[in-house]
């Protein structure tokens, strides 16, 4: 069988073109590459509080924030911090669209490698026994759930059942990362809401942190000089309202325009062109 030909990237972001902007790689790709994770003051504060919750065996914590503020990056960062650390057993669940507590219990147990049991009580007993064994080994079990607003109110009962497993300390720590809709989920299950020890919120970045985030990404990609004039940055910040994800999306389009114009630093007109391209998606969905 003939060997398939390797595809060659021929778009604008070749290594040669990026070098014209003093970049070794693309700084604004929409990926979860941990090298580009910028921890602002608020991200650090939230992460520190979650670390305390885990190490103090406090049980249940929530990190809430609107779309695009970096919840998933912080969640993955949290998982990576414990993944290779002795004494911890973390699992990361990227989407938890659970409808029932049985469904939630089975999926979370499966993330730890436990078999599926037909009856919910059998599933809970098996999982409790597993957690007790971890505790005997002085291993702290951690569940990190992203997009937790997709859980039904009833499915939160699985978490309450897990938190009822105790042997002097909580056998499992649960951190939910969610959009603001999580308030409605908990409002329909106040018993589990009462178990939340820490509720943290991630908000849009202030201008100084936003500028530092964009510069940090450029620095990681090889460029020490600012990519934007002050006015150009303020236009990016304004249209994105301080939210990291749209700032990164607009900045990626700015990069494309700079290469087309053979320019080295983004001025306001470059950003305005990028904003025009960015806003087309909203017009298309209107």
What are these regions (language model features)?
Residues 130-155:
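Conserved P-loop NTPase "ATPase switch" module shared by AAA+ and STAND
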Residues 56-77:
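Walker A/P-loop nucleotide-binding motif
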Residues 95, 185-186, 197-210:
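Conserved AAA+ ATPase "SRH/arginine-finger" region at the nucleotide-binding site
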């Amino acid at each position: 069988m003939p060997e398939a030909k390797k595809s060659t990237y021929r778009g604008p972001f070749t290594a040669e073109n990026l070098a014209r902007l003093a970049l070794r790689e693309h700084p604004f790709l929409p990926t979860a590459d941990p090298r580009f994770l910028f921890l602002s003051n608020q991200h650090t504060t939230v992460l520190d509080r979650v670390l305390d919750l885990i190490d103090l065996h406090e049980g249940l914590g929530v990190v809430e924030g609107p779309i695009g503020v970096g919840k998933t990056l912080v969640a993955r960062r949290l998982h990576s911090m414990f993944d290779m650390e002795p004494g911890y057993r973390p699992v990361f669940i990227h989407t938890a669209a659970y409808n029932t507590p049985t469904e939630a219990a089975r999926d979370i147990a499966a993330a730890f490698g436990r078999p599926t049991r037909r009856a919910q009580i059998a599933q809970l007993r098996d999982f409790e026994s597993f957690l007790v064994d971890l505790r005997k080994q002085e291993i702290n079990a951690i569940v990190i759930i992203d997009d937790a607003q997709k859980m039904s109110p009833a499915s939160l009962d699985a978490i309450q059942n897990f938190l009822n497993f105790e042997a002097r300390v909580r056998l499992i720590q649960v951190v939910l990362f969610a959009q603001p809709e999580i308030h409605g989920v908990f409002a329909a299950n106040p018993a589990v809401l009462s178990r939340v020890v820490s509720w943290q919120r991630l908000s849009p970045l202030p201008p100084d942190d936003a500028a530092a985030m964009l510069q940090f990404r450029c620095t990681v990609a090889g460029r020490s000089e600012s990519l934007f004039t002050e006015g150009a940055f303020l236009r990016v910040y304004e249209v994105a309202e301080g939210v990291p994800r749209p700032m990164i999306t607009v900045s990626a389009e700015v990069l494309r325009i700079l290469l087309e114009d053979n320019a080295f630093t983004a001025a306001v007109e470059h950003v305005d062109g990028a904003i025009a391209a960015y806003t087309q998606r909203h017009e298309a969905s209107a």
